[in-house]
């Protein structure tokens, strides 16, 4: 009896390890990565992300979601729908999908600025939302460069040398001095126009004015004002722009920025859109400002988040798209995607697989307009 037991594995262990599987649905996707025996083909490599698993698969789903936005956007409007374009109170022509793009300031500090500028230059998005740094860093780069450094550089030594660190990017403090010299006369002019012409300034009007004044095609906001793409920044004073406005208020007080008018305008963009898509890089105010505008239409039809934030602390930055569904900020029948990744790595690849592939279609739309 003892010999027999030694020759047979325990039945309970066998049952636990070799448990029977239910059959998966026939449409289930098999995991398969890119085969480099095919040579180096970057399009095929990025397409293979979709079946690789983990965040690579989320990236593949984000590509599908953004392409769905674009396909909808390029659909022609009926004549009746086109006549209601003025309801958005925007100078932009209404399309079949209004795309909101939000991004945090560090992405403009980085080389993602050039990716965002490409989208704005070619009229591929309709509404921008960013923070103060997301505006000023673009303008400052037109005046002086940002440099690569190291995450490990010591703050004490950098401060002694007048160098500011943004992750592994370095911004000489002299850049902000040049920004002040450029900005102060514009603020003087804005105050004069407010007092003599009755101009009612808002953050979006101010950003458009700065984009016009910088007059540099390397700038995101040069192209935004040129293409009538509104830029909303409800926290416009939270950065160097705010510092300069503060200093200017002593020299030439009285400038007023009306955020209520901008609130009406961004919400109106969502309310009267045929459908909407959200692409949000990072979290915080840019993420929620776009999502809350889309609440006014019972949610966005398409949504892609790219950030590294987690939801366990209850922050809006880390909240998954499904939380936004519960608030009515994304529609219940939508298929939103969150990619848990650094946007500086992922976003250019996403644009390469989506907007950049549709360049000819966007150029055709522009020529027709």
Curated annotation (Swiss-Prot):
Effect upon mutating residue 109 to A: Strongly reduced spermidine binding. Reduced activity
- Where Phosphoserine occurs along the chain? 78
**Documented effect of changing residue 313 to A:** Strongly reduced NAD binding
Catalytic activity line of the entry: [eIF5A protein]-L-lysine + spermidine = [eIF5A protein]-deoxyhypusine + propane-1,3-diamine
* UniProt KW keywords: Disease variant, Hypusine biosynthesis, Intellectual disability, NAD, Phosphoprotein, Transferase
Matching entries from SUPFAM superfamilies are given as: DHS-like NAD/FAD-binding domain
**InterPro entries in the record:** Deoxyhypusine_synthase, Deoxyhypusine_synthase_sf, DHS-like_NAD/FAD-binding_dom
- Tell me the impact of changing residue 137 to A: Strongly reduced NAD binding. Strongly reduced formation of covalent intermediate
Q: What does UniProt give as GO cellular component?
A: cytoplasm; cytosol
Task: Give the multimer and partner information.
Answer: Homotetramer formed by a dimer of dimers.
Q: What is this protein called?
A: Deoxyhypusine synthase
The protein's organism comes out as Homo sapiens
């Amino acid at each position: 009896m003892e010999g027999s037991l030694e020759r047979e594995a325990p039945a309970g262990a066998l049952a636990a390890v070799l448990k029977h599987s239910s059959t998966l649905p026939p449409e289930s996707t098999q995991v398969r990565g890119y085969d480099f025996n095919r040579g180096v083909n970057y399009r095929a490599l990025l397409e293979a992300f979709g079946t690789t698993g983990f965040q690579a698969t989320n990236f593949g789903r984000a590509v599908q979601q953004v392409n769905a936005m674009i396909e909808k956007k390029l659909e022609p409007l009926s004549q009746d729908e086109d006549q209601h374009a003025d309801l958005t109170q925007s100078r932009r022509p209404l399309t079949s999908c209004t795309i909101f793009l939000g991004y945090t300031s560090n992405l403009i500090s980085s080389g993602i600025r050039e990716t965002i500028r490409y989208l704005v230059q070619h009229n591929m998005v309709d509404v921008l939302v960013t923070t103060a740094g997301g505006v000023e860093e673009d303008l400052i780069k037109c005046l002086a460069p940002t440099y690569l450094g190291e995450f490990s550089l010591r703050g004490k030594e950098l401060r002694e040398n007048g160098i500011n660190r943004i992750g592994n990017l370095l911004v000489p403090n002299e850049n902000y001095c040049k920004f002040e010299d450029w900005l102060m006369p514009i603020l003087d002019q804005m105050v004069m126009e407010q007092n003599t012409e009755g101009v009612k300034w808002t953050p979006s009007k101010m950003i458009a004015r700065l984009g016009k004044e910088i007059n540099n095609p390397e700038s995101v906001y040069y192209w935004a004002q040129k293409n009538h793409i509104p830029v909303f920044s409800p926290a416009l004073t939270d950065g160097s722009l705010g510092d300069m406005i503060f200093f200017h208020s002593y020299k030439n007080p009285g400038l007023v920025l009306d955020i209520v008018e901008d609130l009406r305008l961004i919400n109106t963009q969502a309310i009267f859109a045929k459908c909407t898509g959200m692409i949000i890089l990072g979290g915080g105010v840019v993420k929620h400002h776009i999502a809350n505008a889309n609440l006014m239409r019972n949610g966005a039809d398409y949504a892609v988040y790219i950030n590294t934030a987690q939801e366990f602390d209850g922050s809006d930055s880390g909240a998954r798209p499904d939380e936004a569904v519960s608030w009515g900020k994304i529609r219940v029948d939508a298929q939103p995607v969150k990619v848990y990744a650094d946007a500086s790595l992922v976003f250019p690849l996403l644009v390469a697989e989506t907007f950049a592939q549709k360049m000819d279609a966007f150029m055709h739309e522009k020529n027709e307009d």
